[in-house]
């Protein structure tokens, strides 16, 4: 009879990281990475049970930040720099939720892409 011995994998500790927040009109995606860009934890409003228009609410962004930061704290993450992008209304509440998680914030960068007369925008809605 063969017996297998399970060895518990040791989690590496990361003290300095980057938080990428993508706030679109439809969803909020939060990713915690280390300095090299390797993902530590990730969450979105859709993965936290929000569906449809509720994914784009500030409360959904707050819950998403809470869930992703819980996983990141297991790795010992303490100091972060924030990179926030996108046109969504959830940006402000996502930032406030991060400040409430007791991280040391070193920098805040806005990485929203701004079109310089690129692709033609979609036609205006007629309701």
Swiss-Prot record:
Gene Ontology molecular function: rRNA binding; structural constituent of ribosome
Parts of the chain that traverse the membrane: none
Keyword Lipid biosynthesis applies: no
SUPFAM superfamilies in UniProt: Translational machinery components
UniProt entry keywords in alphabetical sequence: Ribonucleoprotein, Ribosomal protein, RNA-binding, rRNA-binding
InterPro entries according to UniProt: Ribosomal_uS11, Ribosomal_uS11_bac-type, Ribosomal_uS11_CS, Ribosomal_uS11_sf
The keyword RNA-binding is annotated on this UniProt entry: yes
GO cellular component terms given for this protein: ribonucleoprotein complex; ribosome
Paired cysteines (S-S): none
Protein's GO biological process: translation
Pfam family, one: Ribosomal_S11
Annotated family: Belongs to the universal ribosomal protein uS11 family.
Subunit: Part of the 30S ribosomal subunit. Interacts with proteins S7 and S18. Binds to IF-3.
Role according to the record: Located on the platform of the 30S subunit, it bridges several disparate RNA helices of the 16S rRNA. Forms part of the Shine-Dalgarno cleft in the 70S ribosome.
Protein name (database record): Small ribosomal subunit protein uS11
């Amino acid at each position: 009879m063969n017996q297998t011995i399970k060895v518990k994998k040791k989690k590496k500790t990361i003290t300095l990281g980057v938080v990428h927040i993508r706030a679109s009109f439809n969803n909020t995606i939060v990713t915690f990475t280390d300095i090299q860009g390797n993902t530590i934890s990730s969450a979105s409003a859709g993965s936290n049970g929000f569906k449809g228009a509720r994914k784009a609410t500030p409360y959904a962004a707050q819950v998403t930040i809470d869930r992703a930061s819980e996983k990141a704290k297991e790795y010992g993450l303490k100091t972060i720099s924030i990179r926030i992008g996108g046109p969504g209304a959830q940006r402000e509440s996502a930032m406030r939720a991060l400040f409430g998680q007791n991280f040391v914030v070193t920098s805040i960068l806005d990485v929203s892409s701004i079109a310089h007369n690129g692709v033609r925008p979609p036609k205006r809605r007629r309701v």
